[in-house]
């Protein structure tokens, strides 16, 4: 048995999709276990760019099965759209399956998400308005619609009627917006169920049988630990657990089955939307990193906020996830910067120096990062494939991260293409 979990360690957009794409070529199964189509995974095959939101990033390379597990919330219309686009480009799609237990994002979830963000105005959480949060709300409230319900006309009818009574009252009385039609939603989703029926399976049985048979299984997270509902910068977080722990409940596997826990972090830090960001660069250098790194959201197109690498938050993320293999991406973006800074401690508002990540989101706005400075490099590293061929200062940068975290960096990414990696050890 060989299991691999790929998780983000910052605020998303670390390059998990590329790493998953690389690892999936050797995988028998690729499994997404949380989130929804609020994710944005960009992978390249030659000059062809694929932006995936709901499908696992490994769908392009995996020779076995790609599974959207029970912890994912599924917009079936978005799923069908992505599958069709993949087919148009000649991609294989007959190996993609969805858990019967996965909850369905309904039209009223998307509207709720949108109306709430509009109402919040300047205090927006910064959601993608894809209905993710409201769908998870209904799941916890035990009124959600699951994929298996799309295959049962009577259950689907009952659940949509019950939900629309509440949601339409909310739309009309509170938001002063138009109500939704039961007939339109019911007929549309009944038809969707028939279209997808051969893809809707008991994924937890499939996955656990594969573990028992010693297959290579890659679990793919979306978003990242600093957006985790419990351990992120609450409330500026997502509605699920993008941690390694989320694999167990999100895919239905025991913790004893998880072996290789791979954490992915950029060589600097980015964030989309609102929330504290201690090392943020609101200057020309921040803009330079944004442009060189093409830091614009794959899902929303929003410019990402940029800043120096924050090892305080990274240590927190590695601890919660139990990371035993580290990946550093976009090292090439830092080329040409004379002096590089890495945050190793925070100075609190009352003058204390701390090296741990606080649970108080409001205090983070007042914390000042304490930096270590390292010399940069000028050499182009995008064609480097052997660690020893990196400039000395680039190696010192990587080794500083390793020493602080006490975790080995097994892979360094130096460009967006699949081949632009420096692999220091094989874990597959």
Predicted segments, located by residue:
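Non-transmembrane, aqueous-exposed alpha-helical and coiled segments at domain scale
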Residues: 1-428
């Amino acid at each position: 048995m060989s299991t691999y979990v790929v998780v983000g360690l910052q605020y998303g957009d670390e390059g998990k999709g590329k790493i998953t794409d690389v690892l999936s070529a050797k995988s028998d199964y690729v499994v997404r276990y949380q989130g929804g189509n609020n994710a944005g995974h960009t992978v390249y095959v030659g000059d062809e760019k694929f932006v995936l939101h709901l499908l696992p990033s490994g769908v392009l390379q995996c020779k076995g099965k790609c599974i959207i597990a029970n912890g994912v919330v599924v917009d079936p219309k978005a799923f069908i759209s992505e599958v069709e686009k993949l087919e148009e480009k000649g991609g294989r799609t007959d190996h993609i399956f969805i858990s019967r237990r996965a909850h369905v994002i309904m039209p009223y979830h998307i509207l709720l998400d949108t109306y709430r963000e509009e109402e919040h105005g300047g205090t927006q959480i910064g959601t993608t308005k894809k209905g993710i949060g409201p769908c998870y709300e209904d799941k916890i409230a035990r009124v959600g619609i699951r994929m298996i319900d799309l295959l049962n006309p009577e259950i689907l009818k009952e659940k949509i009627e019950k939900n629309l009574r509440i949601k339409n009252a909310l739309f009309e009385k509170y938001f002063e917006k138009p109500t939704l039609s039961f007939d339109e939603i019911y007929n549309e989703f009944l038809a969707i169920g028939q279209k997808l029926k051969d893809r809707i399976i008991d994924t937890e049985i499939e996955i656990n049988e594969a573990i028992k048979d010693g297959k290579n299984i890659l679990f793919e997270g979306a978003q990242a630990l600093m957006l985790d509902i419990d351990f992120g910068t609450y409330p500026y977080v997502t509605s699920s657990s993008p941690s390694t722990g989320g694999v167990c409940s999100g895919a239905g596997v025991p913790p004893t089955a998880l072996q290789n826990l791979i954490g992915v972090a950029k060589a600097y830090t980015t964030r989309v939307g609102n929330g504290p960001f201690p090392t943020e660069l609101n200057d020309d250098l921040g803009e330079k990193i944004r442009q060189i790194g093409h830091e614009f959201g794959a899902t929303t197109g929003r410019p990402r906020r940029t800043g120096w690498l924050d090892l305080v938050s990274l240590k927190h993320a590695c601890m919660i996830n139990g990371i035993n293999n580290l990946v550093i991406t976009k090292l090439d973006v830092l080329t040409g910067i004379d002096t590089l800074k890495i945050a190793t401690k925070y100075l609190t508002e009352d003058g204390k120096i701390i090296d741990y990540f606080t649970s108080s989101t409001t205090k983070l706005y007042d914390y000042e990062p304490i930096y270590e400075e390292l010399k940069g490099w000028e050499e182009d590293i995008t064609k480097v494939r052997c660690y020893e061929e990196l400039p000395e200062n680039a190696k010192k940068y990587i080794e500083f991260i390793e020493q602080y975290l006490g975790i080995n960096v097994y892979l360094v990414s130096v460009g967006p293409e699949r081949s632009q990696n420096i692999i220091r050890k094989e874990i597959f």
